[in-house]
Amino acid sequence: MKSVTIENHLESLTESSVIWERYTRDAKINPNRYFVFYEGEDRQYYDCRIQQYTETYNTYAVGGKSKVLKLFEKFTQEGESTLANKLFFIDKDYEHHQVNPDIYMTPKYAVENFYVSSTAIKRILKVHFGINDDDPEFGRVLKYFNERHREFIDYLTEMNLWAICCQLNGVKIDFDLLGLKNNADNILKVKYKKLELSVEDISFYYFERKYGEKLREKSESGLEKNGRDYTAELSYFMDKKEYIRSTFANDVEEYRSCIENYFRGKQLLWFLKEFILSVENKSGGILQKQFFIEDRNIMTVFTNCADTPE
């Protein structure tokens, strides 16, 4: 039986059924408002953009993509007119096609991707560091950022292609097992002058092998988390291995050619944070420290500097 913890309680508050109850209550009081539904903490990105068009809206942080889609389905079952003043936002993740024209899906993996680009770093330098684009520091930082960003993408391209191939074959990767859900600290260190790899191999087959090892460790330990059967997961992963390899060998060029659209957003956001901390470093840095950033506040701090796709 699932134990009751603070984490479980907070998770329950984002369940589709709970959000539906909140919405129906709010809609009775203010039926003419806009009602906005999105994944987790994405409000940090969307809210300031929605405010450009209206101040009269309610927002609801639904747990994840599947829960947003479940909620959308419930609205459509109630009748098409119920979508009139509703906005739904989801991340693209590794999806290749639009899920539904009535749902906004990011053109890149997640909203975090909009924070990490040459245009975004230019805004960050101007707005948060007060550096003009004709100042020498501006050009230096921009040059290093573009170089390190390109290297970061290149280093982790095969990791993302491996995950895409897995998903195309019905295997959804748990990046927590690899210690890579929110960053890439297990693989490399970010310095503004260079990226330092912590492992010798970052190929498709490295991630395939490491993931199998992690599943096997969990299976042999007999540990289960929330009823998760690691033995069954390992068996399924091994059964799919050759199909996944075949997909990688024959069917990924379309993804590879635009890999930045399928690149894990949280890892990119971590890269941005580490890069900025490096250029602010007292020993050999370029810029003076202006503010405190960490994983929990970086989206809020830089939200006005992030790209806004058309």
Descriptions of predicted regions:
Residues 1-310:
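Acidic, divalent-metal-binding catalytic cores of TOPRIM
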